[in-house]
From Swiss-Prot:
Binding of ATP, residues: K267
GO MF term list: ATP binding; cysteine-tRNA ligase activity; zinc ion binding
Motif annotated as 'KMSKS' region, chain positions: 264-268
Record gene name: cysS
The protein's name in its UniProt record: Cysteine--tRNA ligase
């Protein structure tokens, strides 16, 4: 499999450090509010990458953190008159409700920054001892210029970064580009004891510590949104590699931005959507499918019209699968069309896998999936039970990689007995060639909200949606 590595700006063949095992770290949310659709993109994209690795037989150690102490959290907690810990607990639970509905598999471990303070202090002390960090009035800063490779992820030199960066020009710093590893206690903020006085960790040190603690000093893949490349991921590399002398991550993967109606999503523009808002109105898998119909590195434009289109597309997959389940019950043992459908499915599955192997190209892969749905819909009525079962299994297999077709239940909605009795009466009328009566019953069923479909395998009844 080839993956685009931000560090080298090329697609590279992925080989894990340890055979059969992939170690991934994905930057998780700051839990001060409900996650928005911009947060949902890395969740869905890198969950899909994990699913594909697992499909290929790898064991995936997947770490996704929660940032549960940070300026936004402190401000909101103080505003609501609760502790940062209470705020974090509330929104971590809300996060899981949304992520579960999006079929995002739970991480192997989801460490919280506040539970790893001791290890953060130890790493900061190590950087001080090696001359990479210094203490000023209870704050600890990283000496950015001392790390010779600073800028290698964002592919900029120090001067370029100085010119374009949003840096804190504190008079305490030796250099404006130096960043905080530890922040001295301020009024109204949570604080922990340290060798430099009470305070709290900086954002960047949190991820370095959690990644190395649970995955080792060099990991296979570090991933997140492209907005994290600088300064967050650049700073993670600097402090981690300064401390260990080893490469921090072999592959750096970044997803593109989500825009709303071709504008950058922001609360101030009033074009801000939470995941909860969308999945309460639309099928959660429609949001997932929508995200995967674009290449993960490209910007993604979100609109209600596009999510509605994704929901219609998702319905086509569910309808195809449901139809296969129905046809299998009464299908013939063999058919002359079997080879044609099997060959089409095998070819499209191979193309799907090739697309996934090429830098997780879910945009192409979903295209092949819908071609497969069209082939199945065209030929299914005249295929054998064995071929229909084969089609159903492959459809389910590929959808599972994408994390869709997982909220399906064939008996999701039982057909009332009186409706089934009317269907049987209509069947008897058709057998007796009493087509006027059959049509009358069909119209009666329609008025009751049901449609009947006559197929070679029998009569199918569905609620009109």
């Amino acid at each position: 499999m080839k993956l685009y590595n931000t560090l080298t700006m090329t697609k590279e063949e992925f080989e894990p450090l340890e055979e059969g095992k992939v170690k991934m770290y994905v930057c998780g949310p700051t839990v001060y509010d409900f996650i928005h659709i911009g947060n949902a993109r890395p969740l869905i994209v890198f969950d899909t990458l994990r699913r594909y690795f697992e499909y290929k037989g790898y064991e995936v150690i997947y770490i996704q953190n929660f940032t549960d102490v940070e300026d936004k959290m402190i401000n909101r907690a103080n505003k609501e008159g609760i502790t940062v810990f209470e705020l974090a607990e509330r929104f971590i639970q809300e996060y899981y409700k949304d992520a579960d509905r999006l079929n995002v598999r739970r991480a192997t471990k989801s460490p919280r920054a506040t539970e790893e303070i001791e290890d953060m202090i130890a790493l900061i002390q190590r950087l001080i001892d090696k001359g990479y960090a210094y203490v000023v009035d209870g704050d600890v800063y990283f000496r950015t210029r001392k790390f010779a490779e600073y800028g290698k992820l964002s592919h900029k030199n120090i001067e370029d970064l100085m010119a374009g960066a949003r840096v804190d020009p504190s008079e305490k710093k030796e250099d404006p580009l130096d960043f905080a590893l530890w922040k001295a206690k301020k009024e109204g903020e949570p604080a922990w004891n340290s060798p430099w006085g009470e305070g709290r960790p900086g954002w960047h040190i949190e991820c370095s510590v959690m990644a190395m603690k649970y995955l080792g000093q060099t990991i296979d893949i570090h991933a997140g949104g492209q907005d994290l490349i600088f300064p967050h991921h650049e700073n993670e590399i600097a402090q981690s590699e300064a401390a260990t002398g080893k490469p921090f991550a072999r592959f750096w993967l970044h997803n593109g931005y989500v825009n709303i109606n071709n504008e950058k999503m922001s609360k101030s523009l009033g074009n801000f959507f939470t995941v909860r808002e969308i999945i309460e109105k639309y099928h959660p898998e429609a949001l997932r499918l929508f995200m995967l119909q674009a290449h993960y590195r490209k910007p993604l434009n979100f609109s209600i019209d596009l999510i509605e289109q994704a929901e219609v597309a998702l319905k086509r997959i569910y309808t195809c699968y449901e139809n296969l389940e129905f046809l299998i019950q009464n299908a013939a043992s063999s058919s002359e069309n079997d080879d044609k459908l099997k060959a089409a499915i095998e070819e499209l599955k191979a193309k799907f896998i090739d697309a996934m192997e090429d830098d997780l190209n879910t945009a192409e892969a979903t295209g092949y999936l819908f071609e497969m749905v069209r082939e199945i819909n065209t030929h299914a009525n005249s295929c054998s039970k064995e071929t229909l079962t084969f089609a159903k299994d492959i459809l389910k297999e590929l959808c599972s990689i994408l994390g869709i077709l997982e909220q399906y239940s064939a008996k999701e909605e039982a057909i009332p007995q009186e409706i089934l009795e009317l269907v049987e009466k209509r069947n008897q009328a058709r057998k007796a060639k009493n087509f006027l009566e059959a049509d009358r019953i069909r119209d009666e069923l329609k008025s009751l909200g049901y449609i009947v479909l006559d197929t070679p395998q029998g009569t199918k009844v569905e609620r009109i949606k």
